[in-house]
């Protein structure tokens, strides 16, 4: 597929947006939700390393993105479930993410891709379910946005009629989902106080 004009700018902007949203969410949730703050911080650090390396496909940058996905997103879900009293699901999600992070070296590139997309979808669906039952509209939007990013990443780009590269759209959706999760955690905290 031929590169789109302005593709590098699009990629840089999507990385900046995701990094800024994740860093803001990490800083503002650090007092009340340390697990979620760590997940947001992992996502911000992964995007920062991608930007610092010039948006390349360096192995270390890809490994950072892998860890941010399989540990960072389950950390977000962990806090979301834990606050609502679903400790077993919280522990299961986080434990599964830790096992995947350790097993990442034993998976091929395709295996890591599929496992990462599965983590995104599982986190999105479980938070969406909790958000529906607790009527947390921000959590619902976050689940939908993260689920859309996970589903879009599975589609073949040449079949899509997109103005931007698929990876950039996924990052924009992830940034929107992260912002919504940040607001959902804030809403949850206000409900419990």
From Swiss-Prot:
It comes from the Eukaryota. Keywords: Membrane, Signal, Transmembrane, Transmembrane helix. It is found in: Membrane. It comes from Bos taurus (Bovine). The chain crosses the membrane at residues 35-55, 63-83, 89-109, 114-134. It is a multi-pass membrane protein. One of its GO terms (cellular component) is membrane. This is Transmembrane protein 276. The keyword Cell cycle does not apply. Residues 1-32 form the signal peptide. The gene is TMEM276.
């Amino acid at each position: 597929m031929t590169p789109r004009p302005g593709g590098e700018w699009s990629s840089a902007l999507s990385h900046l947006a995701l990094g800024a949203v994740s860093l803001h969410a990490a800083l503002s949730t650090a007092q009340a939700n340390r697990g979620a703050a760590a997940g947001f911080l992992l996502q911000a650090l992964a995007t920062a390393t991608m930007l610092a390396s010039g948006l390349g496909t360096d192995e270390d940058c890809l490994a950072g993105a892998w860890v941010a996905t399989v540990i960072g997103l389950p950390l977000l879900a962990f806090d979301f479930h834990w606050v609502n009293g679903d400790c077993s699901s919280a522990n299961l999600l986080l434990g599964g993410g830790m096992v995947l992070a350790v097993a990442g070296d034993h998976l091929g590139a395709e295996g890591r891709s599929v496992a990462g997309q599965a983590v995104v979808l599982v986190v999105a669906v479980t938070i969406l379910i909790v958000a529906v039952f607790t009527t947390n509209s921000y959590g619902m939007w976050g689940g939908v946005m993260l689920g859309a990013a996970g589903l879009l990443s599975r589609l073949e780009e040449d079949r899509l009629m997109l103005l931007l590269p698929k990876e950039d759209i996924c990052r924009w959706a992830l940034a929107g989902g992260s912002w919504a999760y940040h607001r959902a955690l804030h809403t949850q905290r206000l409900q419990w106080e």
